[in-house]
């Protein structure tokens, strides 16, 4: 838990410092997303698992067409799967909680001041595990503390009023590190994945 607070303090410091950069465009505010999460496993049938995130977001752009963004969010992830058994299907629900920090390199389309600006982005995503349950039992010891993945997305930013932006996008995230600890009973590579709709309301430091 102490490490969790240290991560939050460091990232808040980064956010505050970023607002003092000499670039022209900085927006910051709250972010929320929902979608489907899964863990890759070739021997199971995947079902829907609601994945939610909530936290803070900041975007910095030194010109009107390219920028960088970072979020600090709590994310619920995991999988809802079925495995064929002798007596029938075996249901397995894994719920993972992460402090997740996705970074984005963004390409903005259109011009600054347009009422709607489409965008595309890509970047890495880092996660720190804070909770894990398998079928409602605590299984945190079976999962690795750190996770990393890549994400890509498309979306649009809309001006609500002066300096207030509504940001929406659809993001696909694919893990690249095994989320489970290797053992004699588990030697497969299991990767996090998710598809989410992201919504954030951001305040800009520059008038349109």
Outline where the language-model segments fall.
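Predominantly the C-terminal beta-signal and adjacent terminal strand-loop region
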Residues: 71, 76-82, 115, 147, ...
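Extended hydrophobic secondary-structure segments that form protein cores and membrane-embedded regions
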Residues: 28, 120-124, 168-171
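Membrane-spanning beta-strand positions in outer-membrane beta-barrel proteins
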Residues: 25-27, 57, 67, 104, ...
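Cleavable N-terminal export/targeting peptides
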Residues: 1-25, 205-208
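Gram-negative (and chloroplast) outer-membrane scaffold detector with strong preference
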Residues: 32, 59-135, 198-208
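Residues that define the transmembrane beta-barrel architecture of outer-membrane proteins
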Residues: 24, 46-52, 95-99, 116, ...
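Short glycine/proline- and aromatic-enriched beta-strand/turn motifs that initiate or cap beta-hairpins
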Residues: 21-60, 200-208
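Extracellular loop and loop/strand-boundary signature of outer-membrane beta-barrel proteins
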Residues: 40-44, 86-93, 136-142, 182-187
